[in-house]
Amino acid sequence: MEEKKCYLAGKMSGLTFDEMNGWRTDLIPKLKEIASVKDCKIKIINPVDYYNFKNPTHKREEEVEDFDLQQVLSSQLMVIKLKGFDTSPGTIIEYCKGSMKNDLVILGLGTKEEEENLHPWLKRYIRRIENDEDKLCDYIRDYVLI
């Protein structure tokens, strides 16, 4: 059984723990469900599970950056939460580094307004943007986990 790795990218700085983690914890069971339907294993990387502002475990910011980028570059799928994307240097760097990787599918999750207000350069390598988690999961099921 093939295993895919999915990195959940999105703004963390300046957000409460629930704001940075809620959308991720909502999406994880849906991703696991579609993976099981496709007879595929999926490893989901929620960066909040490793480093966060509520329970800091890092000694240097570079440690967090190195870890996150290592996870991005070893993933086949990245889902970016559009809310706050354009004001999150970490998420922008993850996106830029990931966009250089040929086998990484980058998808966006956000409202129509967030999509319309996103700078064209930040949209360039996002294959598809959905405003609903279920539609995003349908796309992943039909076009990514194949």
Please identify what each model-predicted range represents.
Residues 1-146:
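Conserved catalytic or regulatory cores that recognize and/or transform ribose-phosphate-containing ligands
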